[in-house]
Structure formats: C-alpha cells, structure tokens
C-alpha cells in the first residue's frame, strides 16, 4: 500500500519546455529537456528537482500536453526553447515510488492512489496539473530505490483548519 503525504510548495520560478506528444515519445523528450536545461544553466546548480507536469493524458491515443520544468533563479532568462513562468505557492498530496513502481503500467496505481486519496478529494479544484517530481536519474538506480513523487496539487482549504 502506498503512503500518501502532503507538503507545501512555495511559489517558484520555473524553466519550462512544453510539448504535445504521445507516450512513446516521452523518454526522448525528457532527455532533450534535461540537456537543454543543463546547457542553459551552464554548470549552475538547479534550485529544485526536475519535474514532468501532465496538462492532459499522455498515452498511445492522447498527446498531453506534457511540460518539463526545473526551478531556476531570477537571473535565468527565457530562450527560443525555454519558457519561464512562476508557479503559485500551493499544497500538494504525493506518494514516493520506487523505480519498479515507476515502470508502466505499475505507475498507474500510484496516480490512482494519490488522485483518490481523501486529501485530494477534500481539496479538489486546484488549477495546477498532476506531476512527477524526480528524486533520482532512472539509469542511475536499481528497481528498489526511490525515483520520484507522484503529486497532485490541492485546492484551497475549506472549513476550519
């Protein structure tokens, strides 16, 4: 059983590359986005984890869109390939999964667990999209090591705190 937690994510400035693509194109897009971000930062360390934001369904029939993001400092400028946007502060519900759980179709269970959790149901209505927040590089870890968080931004709290 997956453990669902919540956390606060402060407002942050993000480098962004967004593309409409199908599931079979995701790995190449991720490699390209990571390389473009690294080249643009020119050796400077990112200030947050690499994330994939799913603005729509990405599978064999649907093409997203999918957005690769990386938190950046205020001095990073947009380019032809990289947009810059500010994401509002928000709370999110998440579960952390291993590389084995990350493989398709096992990853769908993690998405379902978070999406159907009491936290997400009670605070639905966020305008932000679900995401994968990466903790490790897939090629650098074994199947039993943690790879990413599956996260759903939460809507505003209602009722007493």
List where the protein language model places each region.
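A solvent-exposed interaction/effector surface
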Residues: 1-161
